[in-house]
């Protein structure tokens, strides 16, 4: 199946907003085994939009339009598609009720006739409810071509795609089953080299590597009759892949940490903390609270995290954590001594089971004769205090801080697995 994405909105063409919807939708279509062949952006102009829809209909099986579902006159996506398909616009009862409920809590003057446009769908289409906004989406197939209309704001589009469109497309088109393997501690180039024979000779299942900031994923996909057969085929391939060794001789399974497109090292670590009923604290220098804010982003974080420290300067490390200032000056803040001391003192001061610390050089300049990207991460438990040195070279200041937190989460994750004799 060939799909085409059409982004509607003059603000995209003028550079006022970035079309992140295209990336999101392309990834979702890939998960479903639907190939996106074309992406187009068009302004809020009926004539040009009609031209784009006509072209897309001649070369694609699935046409997805994003944006232009709002209440203003330049929101004309549904109106233009209806004109092209020679269909009427009708009101969706559920969307109308949502409009009524929304404006019932507001001044009567805030509702205008234009708002009613948001509850319209093309006659004969399947409505796609909007759980985070007012503009209803829709799905319709005419003459063998399927059309989808989606709202433009990502906060509305993503839930609609995940909860409404993906299940709908899965039932109608997809026979592709996928499993995403996540790796940390190995680069894409090395992973591809280690698995080159699998990748070069792949048929079914297929293997697709993706490099992300600080980590790599492998998407394993197969076309088969049902989930059970897919699980068997993908499981066999996974076992073969993870039995390989890195170029340093380390088992590939050691740098594999989890499954899923939306998973992360932070989530894996958080879930292990909850599972094993452990609490954690952190003392951060170069990351300035990034580790703690990431941890706190998960619902239920208070089960495992009560608080921590951000000690950016040497003086604050001494003042807040009780580390000897003269020793800090002697060893430097970019050192194993400081990292281990920060982790242990944070743990003792809060009574947490685990203390973690991050100190180093975010860049771009050197610090204490250490190059940018030099990071020490400390970890303290009741029985042990340790640290690792990480070099994150050739990265921006933002990336150094982010990747440093990934290393910290991975260190905590491995510690938890060791404590439970699972690693």
From Swiss-Prot:
Gene name of the record: cinA
Coiled coil: none
Disulfide bridge partners, by residue number: none
Pfam families documented for this protein: CinA, CinA_KH, MoCF_biosynth
Superkingdom, natural source: Bacteria
PANTHER family on file: NICOTINAMIDE-NUCLEOTIDE AMIDOHYDROLASE PNCC, NMN AMIDOHYDROLASE-LIKE PROTEIN YFAY
Organism annotation: Streptococcus pyogenes serotype M2 (strain MGAS10270)
Family label: Belongs to the CinA family.
Signal peptide annotation: none
Name of the protein in its database record: Putative competence-damage inducible protein
HAMAP family named among the record's database cross-references: CinA_B
Entries under Gene3D superfamilies matching the protein: 3.30.70.2860, CinA-like, MoaB/Mog-like domain
């Amino acid at each position: 199946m060939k799909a085409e994405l059409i982004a509607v909105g003059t603000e995209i063409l003028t550079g006022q907003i970035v079309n992140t919807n295209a990336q999101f939708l392309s990834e979702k279509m890939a998960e479903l085994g639907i190939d996106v062949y074309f992406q187009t952006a068009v302004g809020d102009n009926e004539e040009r939009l009609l031209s784009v829809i006509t072209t897309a209909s001649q070369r694609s099986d699935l046409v997805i339009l994003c944006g232009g579902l709002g209440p203003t006159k330049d929101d004309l996506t549904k109106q233009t598609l209806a004109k092209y398909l020679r269909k009427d616009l009708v009101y969706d009862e559920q969307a109308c009720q949502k409009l009524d409920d929304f404006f019932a809590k507001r001044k009567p003057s805030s509702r205008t006739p234009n708002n009613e446009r948001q509850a319209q769908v093309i006659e004969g289409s399947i409505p796609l409810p909007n759980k985070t906004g007012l503009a209803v989406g829709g799905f319709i197939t005419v003459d063998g071509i399927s059309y989808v209309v989606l709202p433009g704001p990502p906060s509305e589009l993503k839930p609609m795609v995940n909860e409404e469109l993906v299940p709908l497309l899965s039932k109608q088109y997809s026979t592709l089953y996928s499993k995403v393997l996540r790796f940390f501690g190995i680069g894409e180039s090395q992973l591809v080299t280690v698995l080159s024979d699998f990748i070069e000779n792949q048929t079914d299942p297929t293997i697709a590597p993706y490099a992300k900031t600080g980590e790599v994923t492998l998407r394993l996909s197969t076309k088969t009759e049902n989930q059970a057969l897919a699980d068997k085929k993908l499981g066999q391939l996974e076992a073969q892949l993870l039995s390989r060794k890195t170029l340093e001789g380390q088992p590939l399974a050691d740098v594999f940490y989890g499954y899923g497109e939306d998973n992360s090292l932070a989530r894996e670590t958080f879930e292990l903390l909850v599972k094993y009923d452990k609490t954690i604290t952190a003392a951060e220098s170069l990351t300035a609270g990034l580790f703690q804010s990431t941890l706190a982003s998960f619902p239920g974080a208070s089960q495992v995290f009560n608080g921590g420290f951000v000690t950016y300067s040497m003086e604050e490390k001494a003042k807040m954590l009780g580390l000897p200032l003269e020793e800090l000056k002697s060893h430097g803040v970019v050192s194993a001594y400081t990292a281990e001391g920060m982790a242990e003192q944070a743990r003792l001061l809060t009574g947490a089971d685990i203390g973690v610390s991050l100190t180093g050089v975010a860049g771009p300049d050197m610090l204490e004769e250490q190059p940018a990207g030099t990071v020490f991460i400390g970890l303290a438990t009741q029985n042990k205090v340790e640290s690792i040195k990480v070099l994150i070279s050739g990265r921006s200041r933002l990336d150094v801080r982010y990747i440093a937190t990934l290393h910290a989460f991975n260190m905590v994750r491995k510690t938890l697995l060791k404590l439970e004799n699972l690693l």
